[in-house]
Curated annotation (Swiss-Prot):
Region of interest (Disordered), residue spans: 140-162
Gene this protein is translated from: smpB
Keywords, sorted A to Z: Cytoplasm, RNA-binding
Protein name in UniProt: SsrA-binding protein
Primary site of residence: cytoplasm
Family annotation (InterPro entries): SmpB, SsrA-bd_prot, SsrA-bd_prot_CS
Protein family: Belongs to the SmpB family.
Length: 162
């Protein structure tokens, strides 16, 4: 299983389970919101072991509710008979105002809801950060990569010479 990493050194209870690093490269994130997620017991235990992937998933507003679609949570080995479905749709908990904001955002051309990080907060509750994003064109992706490479090169030069 994947290793669960602690995101903050000051708070050992804040644990990142899955991160969609590709989303920041493929999309321009306009805003993000923390949402609760409804899980079954075996899903929570599997998440605590680090068995999750949100890279191919997305969020959708359907019938006045927010759903996480195509996210993968590995089966929990000790839950033999009460096993959860690995790629089921999971309901996200969000306020009505944020839900209407998400609905309005997705109605604009090219906008989508992308999961960014799945983690346990300081109270031990599973949370997911959803971003309102617009897909980048190929030249935008190249520009982002060039800026990232230049900043790395600058930091190397400053470290070596300064």
């Amino acid at each position: 299983m994947a290793q669960v990493k602690s995101s903050s050194k000051s708070d050992p209870n804040y644990k990142v389970v899955a991160e969609n690093r590709r989303a920041r490269f493929d999309y321009a994130i306009e805003s993000d919101v923390e949402c609760g997620i409804i899980l079954e017991g075996s899903e929570v235990k599997s998440l605590r072991e680090g068995g999750a992937n949100i890279a191919e998933s997305y969020a959708a507003v359907e019938d006045g509710e927010l759903w996480l679609v195509n996210s993968y949570i590995a089966p929990y080995k000790q839950a033999k008979t009460f096993q959860h479905e690995e790629r089921r749709r999971r309901k996200l908990l969000i306020s009505r105002k944020q839900l209407s904001d998400f609905w309005n955002a997705t109605q604009r051309k090219g906008m989508t809801l992308v999961p960014l990080v799945l983690y346990f907060n300081h109270r031990g509750m599973a949370k997911i950060k959803i971003g309102v994003a617009k897909g980048k064109k190929l030249h935008d992706k190249r520009e982002t990569a060039a800026k990232r490479d230049w900043s790395r090169q600058k930091s190397r030069l400053m470290k070596d010479h300064g």
